[in-house]
């Protein structure tokens, strides 16, 4: 169903290429996961190009739980422990403790403050002491291997920003409908058309990555 609805946007490879081009230009992309999984669409931006206006959109148009996807080595470098010792969530979403920048924020809730926190966390020289805990940004630890290991939005985000040649850090939030329900693919496609954002799926990223591996092989 998802693939047929997305057929007008080209092949899986073409959809991923459109997403990578958007990220390189500092724009957002919409990624839908498998229909038999969450079947939700996330709005994703590269962390290094994230603007206050884009954060405001994430807060306004999405669930408000803005997450910062980071690879395992960055999570370890920042000494961010898992949110809980035993993760019993349905899909094993790897939340760490929430964070706040220690410098340059007020309450930490505003769009500008959340961007400041994200920029502090992704800085090349970032230290654990640069971040207070808890806060209003929710880091997610991506599994090594990306979507070929786990078909989640966290891994899809890291795969996309890396494939785009950007720093391995991305920001995501689940898109919601005006009535507060979760947006599914038809609504995600309409949202993408309204905001001129490409739409792709986790399966598309899997296909793209496997095609790259086949070329190497």
Curated annotation (Swiss-Prot):
GO terms for cellular component: cytosol. Binds 2 divalent metal cations per subunit. Magnesium or manganese. The record marks 136, 174 as: Essential for catalytic activity. GO terms for biological process: riboflavin biosynthetic process. Its cofactor is Mg(2+); Mn(2+). D-ribulose 5-phosphate binds at residues 37-38, 42, 150-154, 174. Pathway: Cofactor biosynthesis; riboflavin biosynthesis; 2-hydroxy-3-oxobutyl phosphate from D-ribulose 5-phosphate: step 1/1. It is an enzyme of class 4 (lyase). GO terms for molecular function: 3,4-dihydroxy-2-butanone-4-phosphate synthase activity; magnesium ion binding; manganese ion binding. It catalyses: D-ribulose 5-phosphate = (2S)-2-hydroxy-3-oxobutyl phosphate + formate + H(+). Keywords: Lyase, Magnesium, Manganese, Metal-binding, Riboflavin biosynthesis. Gene3D superfamilies: DHBP synthase (3.90.870.10). Mg(2+) 1 binds at residue 38. InterPro entries: DHBP_synth_RibB-like_a/b_dom, DHBP_synthase_RibB. It comes from the Bacteria. Its EC number is 4.1.99.12. Mg(2+) 2 binds at residues 38, 153. It holds the Pfam family DHBP_synthase. Belongs to the DHBP synthase family. PANTHER family: 3,4-DIHYDROXY-2-BUTANONE 4-PHOSPHATE SYNTHASE, GTP CYCLOHYDROLASE II-RELATED. Homodimer. Catalyzes the conversion of D-ribulose 5-phosphate to formate and 3,4-dihydroxy-2-butanone 4-phosphate. This is 3,4-dihydroxy-2-butanone 4-phosphate synthase. It comes from Shewanella baltica (strain OS155 / ATCC BAA-1091).
């Amino acid at each position: 169903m998802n693939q047929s609805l997305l057929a007008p946007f080209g092949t899986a490879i073409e959809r991923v290429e459109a997403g990578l081009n958007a990220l390189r230009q500092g724009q957002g992309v919409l990624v839908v996961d498998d229909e038999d999984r969450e079947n939700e669409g996330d709005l994703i931006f590269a962390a290094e190009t994230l603007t206050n206006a884009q954060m405001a959109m994430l807060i306004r148009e999405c669930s408000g739980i803005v997450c910062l996807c980071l690879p395992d080595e960055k999570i370890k470098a920042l000494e961010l422990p898992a949110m809980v010792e035993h993760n019993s969530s349905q899909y094993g979403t790897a939340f760490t403790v929430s964070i706040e920048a220690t410098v340059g924020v007020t309450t930490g809730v505003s769009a500008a403050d959340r961007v400041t926190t994200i920029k502090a966390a992704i800085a090349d020289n970032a230290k654990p002491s640069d971040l207070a805990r808890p806060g209003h940004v929710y880091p997610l630890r991506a599994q090594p291997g990306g979507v070929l290991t786990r078909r989640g939005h966290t891994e899809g985000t890291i795969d996309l920003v890396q494939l785009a040649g950007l720093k391995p850090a991305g920001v995501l939030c689940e898109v919601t409908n005006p009535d507060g329900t979760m947006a599914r693919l038809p609504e995600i496609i309409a949202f993408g058309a309204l905001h001129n954002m490409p739409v792709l799926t986790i399966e598309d990223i899997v296909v793209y990555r496997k095609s790259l591996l086949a070329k190497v092989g």
